[in-house]
Amino acid sequence: MRILAVDDDPVFLMLLEHVLTAIGYKDLRTVESGAEAMTLLRDPRQKFDCLLLDIDMPGMTGIELCRRVRALQDYHDTPVVMITAMKSLDFVEPAFRAGANDYVHKPIDELEMRTRLRMVGDLIEERRRRASVESRFSTDHGLPVINVRFDEPVALSEAGSVIDYLALENYALTLGRLRLYGHSVLGFKVTNAESIFCSTDGIGYIDTMANVASVIDGALKSCNHLIAHAGRGEFVAMISQRTDLDVDLLQDEIDLAMDRYAHLHEALGIPLPDVTVGRILHTGFFTRTSVSSLFKEARQSVRDVAMVR
């Protein structure tokens, strides 16, 4: 794994290099500003597998740098881990909105960094495997292709509040139990997602799920929220307040918005997505519900609603 680390503190970069070397990551390049990083990233002779970005830098912040990185075709889905010494979590959500995949605190803990980079490595290997399959198919048939599994939480980027599922889990983990108590979680399900998946190719399926994400994003516009596609046509939304939205009204708004795509889907021969809204969930103040369990509960909730709808 070739890593680029960006931080305006040269002493921290030396310490980071020491930690990374100790856990087996020796191919590291460091720079001290966002401008230097962008120069490297635009150089076709350079290629990095993972970016470690300090959030609080003078001039171009790490969040702005992350946003610019995501605009580069070669780094659209490269894993980005944000690093910061700031204690406030006010900037965490903007970092994930900008495209970050994960987040760690200074001072760097060796075990935490090892765990984060192991997850990054797994993500890189999965994306390399998919790219290899897509490349072979494209070479054999001369057609663009995206290799997608139905149960895979494929990344969608068309809507402003949509982030990767892993990133949403990582964001929720940064909140801690107290802050998580102040959030609401809501599941959505495209009940005919498997029919859509079978009726089109990977590009068509991702485009359709992206349209659904945009509709959900619009329906939740009155709330500060983040959305992720969890696979199998299911979505999880985190709302940054304890809310009791009228789920029936939300369902009606989504149905109405999806109807606007009816003519397009008819022309393409792809079933129009049938989206179901689940129940709004909250964590208890004294409970120790894990983030993964909370998200699973949200997905199960919408499955239950879909069965009786």
Model-derived segments and their meaning:
Residues M57, V69:
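Receiver (REC) domain active-site loop signature in two-component systems and cognate sites
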Residues H225-S240, H263-E297:
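A short glycine-enriched loop-to-beta-strand structural element that forms part of the catalytic core
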Residues M1-L20, L51:
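Conserved acidic segment of CheY-like receiver
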Residues D122-G176:
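CheY-like receiver
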Residues V154-L173, R179-S184, T191-D217, A228-R232, ...:
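Conserved long alpha-helical elements within nucleotide-processing catalytic cores of c-di-GMP signaling
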Residues D7, D54, T84:
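Active-site residues of response regulator receiver
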